[in-house]
From Swiss-Prot:
Protein name: Probable ribonuclease FAU-1
Pfam assignment, any one: DUF402
Function: Probable RNase involved in rRNA stability through maturation and/or degradation of precursor rRNAs. Binds to RNA in loop regions with AU-rich sequences.
Keywords of this entry: Endonuclease, Hydrolase, Nuclease, RNA-binding, rRNA processing
Phylogenetic placement of the source organism: Archaea, Thermoproteota, Thermoprotei, Thermoproteales, Thermoproteaceae
EC number(s) from the headed UniProt entry: 3.1.26.-
């Protein structure tokens, strides 16, 4: 199987993929140099790219290849893995069950963008353009999109290009569309990134085959039927421990400092290359140095959604980083039930070691109104405080503890490796976050 790998994990994942027997296609110049690879620009069976958090990868491609890659990744790195129930460009017969909603295969309801406005009760052919992942709603359009190695054909007219195709190649491919694909008429064509390496004849042959498929798909079928499978999609998220395993793999290829991938997620570039070259063991100090001034807390859901919370680092006290965050008035504190008034703020305590983050909420006068403990993977310090949410939370109000979101955790428990399952004993002892770190009892104002 052929894999194309891009992003900050490319060296480590290329080493693993080669060990697993995958062929590397369309490698970057740096990867060719590091592994002494022959240049193979044939289309991939599976593509691996960074997730937006830089703490995981999106795996997209032929279903068998995606499954094989992800399972080997589980064995080697032990990440959090979520697989989409539907594929990108699955073509199906759907029934419109509400305004902007279509029922797809297996009763899954997907959102239809407002510009299409299909009639409620109608049945037609749809294509998945964004698969549902976890609780995140998927998106389908009442178009037919058929995808090959080099091109996609669709019932939406126009000529489009992958953003990875340079301008010079776009000129060639646009000319090809005008001179050799004019018979497509009102159909649309999108040139995929692999098209820049393809001979014109190969592109034309594929377009002809896809056109014949599209004509057959337009005939439809029974509601709920999948007429054509697209590309499978999976998300693998790397917590701090998984990144350390990837550091070890990378170290077997090139000099790699401890914490390399965690620091890459902080956005470090040339200075990290220098640490790698010098072999300096400076991860803890570097992470602590970065966690000064303005910081962001990146709360990553297992299915890839990110909640970003901005704050100001108060300081490091022992093994705790304290962050002060202003709260936007008008809402209600989740799990605590107190309305957020103007001037409310949170003190967040982030451990150097541990699997939870403590948020204590305060009035403008400094009176604590409750504490919310998020159970998560071990946080990574820096200007971005990064962790993966394990979906279980504990709220303390008036000395009483409430466990939150257990049902959600049980629904997604299988996506977590065993080592990240929420620990027992999170309810005791009750703690709170103060300006100088963790305290055992919630602080009270003088008037309390």
């Amino acid at each position: 199987m052929k894999v194309r790998i891009r992003g900050i994990f490319a060296t480590a994942l290329t080493k693993l993929a080669l060990d697993w027997g995958f062929s590397i296609v369309q490698p970057t110049g740096k990867i060719v140099e590091r592994f002494d690879l022959p240049v193979d620009n044939s289309p991939p069976d599976v593509t691996v790219i960074d997730h937006e958090s830089k703490s995981g990868v999106v795996v997209l491609g032929k279903c068998g290849a995606v499954e094989a890659f992800v399972e080997r990744l589980r064995e080697a790195v032990d990440p959090v893995v979520v697989k989409a129930d539907l594929g990108v460009h699955d073509v199906f017969v759907g029934k419109v069950v509400g305004e902007g909603r279509v029922e797809g295969p297996g009763g899954i309801v997907l959102r239809v963008p407002p510009r299409f406005a299909p009639t409620v009760g109608s049945v037609g052919v749809f294509t998945v353009v964004r698969p549902p992942l976890g609780p995140v709603e998927g998106v389908a359009v009442p178009d037919i999109i058929v995808e090959g190695d080099y091109v996609e054909l669709s019932t939406s007219p126009g000529v489009r290009f992958s953003r990875h195709i340079p301008e010079g190649e776009r000129v060639r491919l646009r000319l090809l569309a005008e001179t050799r694909l004019g018979w497509l008429g009102g159909l649309g064509v999108r040139f995929k990134s692999s098209a820049r390496f393809a001979e014109d004849e190969a592109v034309v042959r594929e377009a002809e085959a896809l056109y014949r498929e599209l004509v057959e798909l337009a005939k439809g079928g029974e509601a709920g039927a999948v007429l054509r499978r697209g590309r499978c999609l999976a998300l693998a998220l790397f917590d701090k421990a998984a990144k350390e395993r990837l550091d070890e793999v990378r170290r077997s290829v090139v000099p790699t400092a401890r914490g390399h991938h965690a620091l890459r997620a902080q956005g470090l570039g040339k200075c990290l290359d220098l640490l790698d070259y010098l072999g300096v063991e400076a991860y803890e100090r570097a992470a602590e140095f970065l966690a000064r001034g303005a910081v962001e807390i990146w709360h990553i859901k297992p299915w890839g959604e990110m909640v970003k919370m901005r704050g100001e680092a108060v300081g490091v006290f022992g093994d705790w980083l304290v962050v002060k965050r202003p709260l936007r008035p008008g809402g209600v504190l989740d799990g605590i039930g107190v309305k957020i008034e103007r001037g409310f703020y949170a003190l967040t305590c982030v451990p150097r070691r541990g699997n939870y983050v403590v948020h204590t909420y305060y009035t403008p006068e400094g009176r604590a109104v409750g504490t919310y403990i998020n159970v998560n993977s071990e946080p990574e310090w820096g200007r971005r405080i990064i962790y993966i949410d394990l979906l279980v939370d504990v709220a303390y109000v008036g000395g009483e503890a409430k466990v939150l979101d257990l049902e959600e955790y049980r629904r997604y428990e299988d996506v977590f490796p065993a080592r990240l399952r929420p620990p027992s004993g999170v309810l005791s002892p009750p703690v709170a976050c103060g300006e100088r770190g963790i305290i055992e009892a919630p602080p009270q104002s003088a008037s309390s």
